Amino acid sequence: MASSNLLSLALFLVLLTHANSASQTSFSFQRFNETNLILQRDATVSSKGQLRLTNVNDNGEPTLSSLGRAFYSAPIQIWDNTTGAVAASPTSFTFNIDVPNNSGPADGLAFVLLPVGSQPKDKGGLLGLFNNYKYDSNAHTVAVEFDTLYNVHWDPKPRHIGIDVNSIKSIKTTTWDFVKGENAEVLITYDSSTKLLVASLVYPSLKTSFIVSDTVDLKSVLPEWVIVGFTATTGITKGNVETNDILSWSFASKLSDGTTSEALNLANFALNQIL
């Protein structure tokens, strides 16, 4: 069975065994503090060191119409305009989404790569990423969403994990059997040689896993420098709310010459630990 520590260790061992990068960034948070984060709207760090993306009341219950985003404080170079190199950028994190007994979940959270200086967009099903569901090439946005509520205009009916490129309407999805209150461990990798983005989610206590992948040309979608982090929202109608907490997060970005495939190999390694 995989664990957060195993994923984090594997992530950094793989990166450290390759020394052909011109630019590399890595960090790992087992507890969060505000020093290394950019927090927007309702995002806070709890007294337990958890990254709480959306608001809760004094009783610890989630509130309606909450939107929060959080990013690593320093910009990340995702590709190099001089050499054309694109970064291999694996990340692993653990999150927990809980739902009150008298409620259904809404709306979800996402791991995102956005232009430096990006500000929150619309709440609810748009996850703070967009103002509408139409494709916008000027959004320069790549995200992996963990969507807990069906939105008729752009979502497939089951709850799902999706890859988003410049639109909340995912280019690829997989059904996600969401379980409230369970820790979910996520590994996302990008292989710069194949342009393959792979996202996997595991519920360790249940021994269930989900995976989605598609090709994404990061160099054509994103600016050279981006911010990386998370966004989450709660529902805008009564009876649809959830907590959205990130418990730990590891990230590494390494400019590649396009000849290695450590990102894809790492995804396969992680999946083999839990299948």
UniProtKB/Swiss-Prot annotation:
Record's protein name: Erythroagglutinating phytohemagglutinin
InterPro entries for this protein: ConA-like_dom_sf, L-lectin, Lectin_LegA_CS, Lectin_legB_Mn/Ca_BS, Legume_lectin_dom, Leguminous_Lectin
Keywords from the named record: Glycoprotein, Lectin, Mannose-binding, Plant defense, Signal, Toxin
Source superkingdom: Eukaryota
UniProt cross-references to PANTHER family, sorted A to Z: CONCANAVALIN A-LIKE LECTIN FAMILY PROTEIN, LECTIN
Record CDD domains: lectin_legume_LecRK_Arcelin_ConA
Family statement: Belongs to the leguminous lectin family.
GO molecular function: D-mannose binding; toxin activity
UniProt-listed GO biological process terms: defense response
Disulfide bond recorded as keyword: no
Record: glycosylation sites: N33, N81, N101
Its biological purpose: This insecticidal carbohydrate-binding lectin is toxic for the cowpea weevil.
Organism: Phaseolus vulgaris (Kidney bean)
Annotated signal sequence range: 1-21
Pfam families in alphabetical order: Lectin_legB
Gene3D superfamilies: 2.60.120.200
Residue runs in coiled coils: none
